[in-house]
A protein has these predicted regions:
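Amphipathic alpha-helical "lid/sensor" segments that cap RecA-like P-loop NTPase cores
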Residues: 1-23
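C-terminal leucine-rich, beta-strand-based interaction scaffolds used for sensing/assembly
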Residues: 19, 23-106
Length: 106
């Protein structure tokens, strides 16, 4: 039986996958400090080259460059964020976690 997958079915399946990963994502967040979560969420919502720019920090309520640096140290060590060498942009490594964080109001 052939069936053409509709955009609605793709969207619904994607939502189900995100929901099925929710417990894992929440476990990841429980291991992090509030400052680390703030950095991770900022990167998910707005990947950037200019993580330490005053405007970016203000938009995402990031308090200090030192806090960002410490957060990045942990987040890169846990393989949660990376800086792409070619574009020099900070992003969340796991695309599902990225989407979940970007949509979530933390």
């Amino acid at each position: 039986v052939e069936h053409t997958v509709t955009p609605k079915e793709v969207t619904e399946t994607y939502r189900l996958v995100l929901e099925s990963e929710r417990v894992l994502f929440e476990t990841v967040l429980r291991r992090l400090t509030a400052k680390q979560i703030a950095v991770l969420t900022a990167i998910a919502k707005e990947p950037t080259k200019k993580l330490f720019a005053a405007e970016y920090m203000e938009r995402h309520n990031l308090k200090s460059t030192g806090g960002i640096q410490r957060g990045l140290s942990v987040l890169t060590g846990e393989d949660l964020v990376e800086q792409h060498p070619a574009e020099d942009i900070w992003t969340v490594v796991d695309p599902l976690l990225w989407q979940w964080l970007a949509e979530k109001a933390l």
